[in-house]
């Protein structure tokens, strides 16, 4: 797949900002130059080398191991032989490393451990510079700023307190550090992955690249079809953003989909295999307790989480407690040895408006808070997954309860969808809820594509989902008073009022689409300097009339 960056993001170049504490780190940002060539703004960029016009990437080679020296220079990790996996050699990543890194002893190698010990890591400085997006010179345009300047020390404090996480497995050195927390920019996740109906490794890798070029901050590989292990290896080796998974899917695949044959040893083996590959965060459905399952029987849509349903069925078959819950501390020992973050799964989330905010959902949430405390004692990073399907008037309660039960650990929500009546448009029904819940304090929003509830998303669906959720996240950032969000709106509105059409296109989330819509009715180059568009024409343009009014008032 050939991506033309000059078409997707005209008048943009990747530039690299050096660190101050760590002089050797360089943070990539997208510089958008205005048509007058004298002004520009910097935009947070998630594409890594895939969004740099000067770098030719090849998915067969993977991308640069940006953090490898940072990791090994700490001298608290060592190489060992990776577990041997029986996979189809014809689909294997060609440059697969047979060694993996792990902590040298029982001491954690997590960003939380370093933060608690007053160590500012290169990862922490990196995310601080990314979050600021060079806003200092433009702060005069940001009234009512309520978010402080992001410094490496602030990042350290937030990670140490558990209010933010930096997902960064030591076996994923290709990743560019990013931070998830309510005092930072709202992030978005894009789900990709094959199914039993559709399995194509090349297609999934390109979905990942497409997603991050358009702004996905993390990607989850939710593959349930063929070649799960190899698909994930290809994705990780080519990904500059953190990769998350739901390990229970592959564990179930190992027992041919027979839930009753699952056990903790199979799950543990799967965790370690994925840890060695470099997965940055795991969704673990440890809060689905046996005693909670009874409260889902009267729901309209029952248990809609795949992981939650698997665990519930296992508990029912064996009449035993959830093995993820009973072995949680052993899972923590694995996580802290590789710096894998927990994404504590909401296996009992509501799957319909009728089931929102019910007893099962909030009992599980309370348990997730208890598990968060245990993980923090092991210096593991934690975020909490949330719903789901929730009407607008019930959204705030979700955030309030999550903050209370989970002690401000970052909240990561799927939408929520605010109505169930629009299959084919659930990227919109969910973006309404996503913007609201982001404003209330959710740290990361999991995108929903137009194909939700209908089928596996294709490349265009991925793009639509990412753009829709970038809008929701940005709207939440504006509501929270984030100055870097305000600056982009200010710049685009200024271009719009002054009929600088190309600057208006180029500052938008999707310049290619914005320009194509303008071209449908006014395709000529002359129209790109006209003081009107086809909506109002030259006589009824309110902005043109306002310009004349302002001119008259100065005479």
Swiss-Prot record:
Its cofactor is [4Fe-4S] cluster. It catalyses: 5-amino-1-(5-phospho-beta-D-ribosyl)imidazole + S-adenosyl-L-methionine = 4-amino-2-methyl-5-(phosphooxymethyl)pyrimidine + CO + 5'-deoxyadenosine + formate + L-methionine + 3 H(+). Zn(2+) binds at residues 389, 453. GO terms for biological process: thiamine biosynthetic process; thiamine diphosphate biosynthetic process. It comes from the Bacteria. Keywords: 4Fe-4S, Iron, Iron-sulfur, Lyase, Metal-binding, S-adenosyl-L-methionine, Thiamine biosynthesis, Zinc. Pathway: Cofactor biosynthesis; thiamine diphosphate biosynthesis. It holds the Pfam family ThiC-associated. Its EC number is 4.1.99.17. Binds 1 [4Fe-4S] cluster per subunit. The cluster is coordinated with 3 cysteines and an exchangeable S-adenosyl-L-methionine. GO terms for cellular component: cytosol. Substrate binds at residues 191, 220, 249, 285, 305-307, 346-349, 385, 412. InterPro entries: ThiC, ThiC-associated_dom, ThiC/Bza_core_dom, ThiC/BzaA/B. [4Fe-4S] cluster binds at residues 533, 536, 541. One of its GO terms (molecular function) is 4 iron, 4 sulfur cluster binding. NCBIfam families: PRK09284.1, PRK13352.1, thiC. Catalyzes the synthesis of the hydroxymethylpyrimidine phosphate (HMP-P) moiety of thiamine from aminoimidazole ribotide (AIR) in a radical S-adenosyl-L-methionine (SAM)-dependent reaction. Homodimer. Belongs to the ThiC family. This is Phosphomethylpyrimidine synthase. It comes from Ehrlichia ruminantium (strain Welgevonden).
């Amino acid at each position: 797949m050939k991506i033309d960056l000059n078409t997707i993001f005209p008048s943009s170049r990747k530039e690299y900002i050096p660190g101050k504490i760590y002089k050797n780190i360089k943070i990539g940002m997208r510089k958008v130059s205005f048509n007058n060539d004298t002004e520009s703004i910097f935009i947070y960029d998630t594409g890594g080398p895939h969004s740099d016009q000067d770098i030719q990437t090849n998915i067969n080679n993977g991308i640069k191991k940006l953090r490898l020296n940072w990791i090994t220079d700490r001298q608290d990790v060592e190489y060992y032989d990776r577990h041997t996996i029986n996979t189809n050699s014809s689909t294997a990543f060609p440059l697969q490393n047979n060694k993996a890194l792990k902590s040298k002893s029982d001491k954690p190698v997590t960003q939380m451990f370093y933060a608690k010990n007053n160590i500012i890591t290169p990862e922490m400085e990196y995310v601080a510079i990314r979050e600021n997006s060079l806003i200092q010179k433009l702060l005069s345009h940001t009234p009512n700023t309520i978010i402080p300047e992001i410094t490496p020390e602030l990042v350290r404090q937030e990670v140490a307190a558990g209010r933010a996480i930096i997902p960064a497995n030591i076996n994923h050195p290709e990743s560019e550090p990013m931070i998830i927390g309510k005092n930072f920019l709202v992030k978005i996740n894009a789900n990709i992955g094959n199914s039993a109906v559709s399995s194509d490794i090349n297609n999934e890798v390109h979905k990942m690249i497409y997603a991050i070029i358009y702004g996905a901050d993390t990607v989850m590989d939710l593959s349930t079809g063929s070649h799960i292990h190899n698909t994930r290896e290809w994705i990780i080796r080519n990904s500059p953003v953190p990769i998350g998974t739901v390990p229970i899917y592959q564990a179930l695949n190992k027992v041919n989909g027979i839930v009753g044959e699952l056990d903790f040893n199979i799950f543990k083996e799967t965790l370690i295999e994925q840890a060695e590959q470099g997965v940055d965060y795991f969704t673990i459905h440890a809060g689905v307790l046996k005693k909670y399952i009874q409260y889902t029987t009267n729901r309209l849509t029952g248990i809609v989480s795949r992981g939650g349903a698997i665990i519930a069925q296992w508990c029912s078959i064996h009449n035993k407690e959830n093995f993820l819950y009973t072995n949680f501390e052993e899972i923590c020992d694995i996580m802290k040895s590789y710096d894998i973050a927990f994404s504590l799964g909401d296996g009992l989330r509501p799957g319909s408006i009728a089931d929102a905010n019910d007893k099962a959902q909030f009992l599980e949430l309370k348990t997730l808070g208890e598990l968060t405390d245990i993980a923090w004692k092991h210096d593991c990073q934690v975020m909490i997954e949330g719903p789901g399907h929730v009407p607008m008037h019930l959204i705030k309660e979700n955030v309030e309860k999550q903050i209370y039960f989970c002690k401000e650990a970052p909240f990561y929500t799927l939408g929520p969808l605010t109505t169930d009546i629009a299959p084919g448009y659930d990227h919109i029904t969910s973006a309404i809820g996503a913007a609201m819940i982001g404003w209330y304090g959710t740290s990361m929003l999991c995108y929903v594509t137009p194909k939700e509830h209908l089928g596996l998303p294709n490349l265009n669906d991925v793009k639509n989902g990412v753009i829709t959720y970038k809008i929701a996240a940005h709207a939440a950032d504006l509501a929270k008073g984030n100055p870097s969000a305000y600056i982009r709106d200010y710049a685009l509105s200024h271009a719009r009022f002054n009929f600088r059409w190309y600057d208006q296109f180029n500052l938008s989330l999707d310049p290619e689409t914005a320009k194509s819509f303008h071209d449908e009715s006014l395709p000529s180059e002359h129209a790109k300097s006209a003081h009107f568009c086809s909506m109002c024409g030259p006589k009824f343009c309110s902005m043109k009339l306002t310009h004349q009014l302002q001119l008259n008032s100065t005479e």
